[in-house]
């Protein structure tokens, strides 16, 4: 086998709470993470020459050693003394810099793909440990199972997520949001409303999507909306079109809404497409990285 093709899925946050800050600048968080069926395709091909090449359909990501997928391949090459090279091609569908872990998901796909391609026989836990060196979201993206994430996001407790037929409307406005600046703008002593994650987990367990939708809280949202009112406007469009609930994912700028039926989600999509290009109707998922082809 010298070629492998993988699906690399996006995530949304059903809640985000920030509990404090570490000495190294990372924050202690508690959040519920949910994979969705919006994915990039990552193709990995072995090369005879000992180098790492990155190519993509997107003009918005670096194609050199600054790309997280390059770093993922380099970590495995160095750790296991691999003398072969690889070409990594990313067919981008997940919006870039959107708060949906697109880059982390791509890195997770490279770790899983090279584990198979190079027959390293690493367990999922071993891959997650390596992935944590690349980013806090990478371990979650490897498995993709809905989880309560704690610590800096690396401590994962599997939970029951949204039913797989849940209709989700996604809108990524053409805005740049600095995650660092959002966290810097957070006043932890003045948070008016925090998520009740225990209650949210119970709502997920009982598949009460209405209660889930009404209980979603992202404490980063007000900081980002303070800089970009547009995010609030998108939420209002979703709610006007019968979303059960709408919230910003991650530090933004992506907004999502949960819908009881697909027809309402599609009507909301049509309205948002009048102003925004990156609008999708997708379902929730229980999967992370998925191998969808191995070739010699």
UniProtKB/Swiss-Prot annotation:
Which keywords describe this protein according to UniProt? ATP-binding, Isoprene biosynthesis, Kinase, Nucleotide-binding, Transferase
Pfam families in the cross-refs: GHMP_kinases_C, GHMP_kinases_N
Enzyme Commission number(s) of this protein: 2.7.1.148
Pathway the protein contributes to: Isoprenoid biosynthesis; isopentenyl diphosphate biosynthesis via DXP pathway; isopentenyl diphosphate from 1-deoxy-D-xylulose 5-phosphate: step 3/6
Q: List the disulfide bonds.
A: none
Q: Name one GO biological process term.
A: terpenoid biosynthetic process
Q: Look up the domain of life of the source.
A: Bacteria
List the GO molecular function terms. Answer: 4-(cytidine 5'-diphospho)-2-C-methyl-D-erythritol kinase activity; ATP binding
Residues the record marks as active site: 11, 137
Q: Cite the binding residues for ATP.
A: 95-105
Q: Which reaction does it catalyse?
A: 4-CDP-2-C-methyl-D-erythritol + ATP = 4-CDP-2-C-methyl-D-erythritol 2-phosphate + ADP + H(+)
Cited InterPro entries: GHMP_kinase_C_dom (IPR013750), GHMP_kinase_C_sf (IPR036554), GHMP_kinase_N_dom (IPR006204), IspE (IPR004424), Ribosomal_Su5_D2-typ_SF (IPR020568), Ribsml_uS5_D2-typ_fold_subgr (IPR014721)
* Family per similarity comment: Belongs to the GHMP kinase family. IspE subfamily.
Role according to the record: Catalyzes the phosphorylation of the position 2 hydroxy group of 4-diphosphocytidyl-2C-methyl-D-erythritol.
List the protein's name.
4-diphosphocytidyl-2-C-methyl-D-erythritol kinase
Recorded name of the encoding gene: ispE
